[in-house]
Structures are given as C-alpha cells and as structure tokens.
C-alpha cells in the first residue's frame, strides 16, 4: 500500500497490515528501503519501498482482505524470487535471505 498524505511510515504500515490481513502486529523495526517503479493508468511513478521487521512468537490468525487473495506461512529461504512481481520486493527478500549482492 501507499502512505497517505500527512501519514508516517509507521502509521501507514499498521493501517495497511490491518486493512490487508485484519491483524495487529508489532513492534516494528525499520530495516532498509529500495527504490521502485510503479505504473498506474499509463503513468510511471518512482517510489521508495520501506521494509520493516517484527518478531512473532506465535502465528496470528490472519484474514485475507482488501487486495489479498490468500495467505501462507513460508520460510524466507523457500521463497521463489521469480514469483515476486516488484523488483524492490525481490531485492528485499534476497537481502533478507543473505544474498551478498542484494544491495
């Protein structure tokens, strides 16, 4: 999702997680950002994607909502990067998987 006008990254993160998964998580820790390009209605927007982490001690019950069709729990090392649409998210997952050339 996007950060609304006059909204902090942290507030947008909490709002988007609630809208998309119907769950409240946190506390969050900012880890890094990656540039991205997002095309909408024929216009190419340059954006910055911010990535945060939180620790889970148990799997919360999530409900796929809004733009989410389904959810699954998967080990980060098992994520198939070719199935991720946005370059910025592929780079972030690769970085978290420990890829040396991810940044």
Spans of model-derived segments:
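Conserved Nudix-box catalytic region and its N-terminal flanking loop in Nudix hydrolases
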Residues: 1-20
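Active-site-adjacent beta-strand/loop module that shapes the phosphate/pyrophosphate-binding cleft
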Residues: 34-60
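Short connector loops at helix/strand junctions that flank enzyme active sites
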Residues: 10, 25, 45-49
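Structural detector for helix-capping/boundary residues
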Residues: 1, 15, 28, 74-77
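Nudix hydrolase/Nudix homology domain
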Residues: 61-103
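Residues at secondary-structure transition points
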Residues: 3-8, 43, 68, 84
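A short coil-to-beta-strand element that immediately follows conserved catalytic motifs
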Residues: 23-33
């Amino acid at each position: 999702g996007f950060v609304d006008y006059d909204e902090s990254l942290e507030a947008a993160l909490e709002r988007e997680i609630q809208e998309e998964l119907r769950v409240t998580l946190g506390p969050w820790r900012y880890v890094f950002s990656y540039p991205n390009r997002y095309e909408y209605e024929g216009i190419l927007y340059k954006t910055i994607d911010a990535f945060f982490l939180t620790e889970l001690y148990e799997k919360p019950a999530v409900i796929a909502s809004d733009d989410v069709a389904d959810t699954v729990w998967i080990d980060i090392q098992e994520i198939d990067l070719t199935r991720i649409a946005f370059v910025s998210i592929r780079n972030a997952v690769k970085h978290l998987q420990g890829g040396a050339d991810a940044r």
